[in-house]
């Protein structure tokens, strides 16, 4: 819990670094647990920004493998994987990002997962854009932003519009 509290402090004040020993402690813990449940997913979901891509990708692959075995906490799994994908894209790690593009889509087949499906659409556009398909990538991201607007999700639309202009 102290580690989670520290992560919130670091996210609020970027001048406060996240302690490297916490990353080691969390990593040791996660890879000592046989099955990741809701606590472990929440832990990763709150700390993913502090992990380097090789470690984050290893965690993402483990999450993907566990959901295919158990199907538990599916919505939290999808959100966590989407966040990892977005992080890979923002850090220009397109090879790792491709893993998430390909593995998340089958998880979002349920039509009631509107937020997750639209975020997938946005990230797919960002992935295209970062891969050199600038025009089609921008079009896809703008479509996702428009969908948020149509659904009355103005804050989401505004947040992703900021992402679009980065």
What are these model-derived regions, one by one?
Residues 107-166:
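Long, positively charged, glycine-interspersed low-complexity recognition regions
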Residues 11, 15-18, 48, 89-92, ...:
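Hydrophobic/aromatic side-chain positions at a characteristic register within alpha-helices
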Residues 25-31, 64-69, 101-110, 142-153:
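Amphipathic alpha-helical segments of tetratricopeptide repeats
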Residues 1-28:
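Hydrophobic alpha-helical segments and helix pairs
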Residues 1, 19, 56-57, 94-98, ...:
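Solenoid-repeat scaffolds in large eukaryotic assemblies
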Residues 40-114:
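Alpha-helical adaptor scaffolds
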């Amino acid at each position: 819990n102290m580690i989670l509290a520290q992560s919130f402090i670091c996210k609020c004040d970027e001048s406060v670094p996240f302690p490297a020993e916490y990353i080691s402690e969390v990593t040791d813990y996660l890879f000592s647990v046989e099955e990741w449940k809701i606590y472990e997913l929440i832990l990763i979901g709150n700390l993913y920004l502090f992990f380097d891509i090789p470690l984050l990708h290893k965690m993402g692959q483990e999450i993907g493998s566990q959901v295919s075995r158990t199907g538990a906490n599916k919505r939290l799994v999808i959100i966590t994987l989407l966040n990892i994908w977005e992080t890979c894209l923002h850090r220009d790690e397109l090879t790792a990002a491709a893993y998430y593009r390909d593995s998340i889509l089958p998880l979002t087949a349920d039509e009631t997962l509107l937020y997750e499906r639209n975020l997938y659409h946005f990230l797919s556009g960002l992935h295209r854009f970062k891969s050199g398909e600038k025009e089609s990538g921008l079009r896809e991201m703008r479509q996702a932003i428009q969908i948020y607007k149509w659904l009355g999700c103005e804050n989401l639309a505004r947040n992703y519009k900021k992402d679009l202009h980065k």
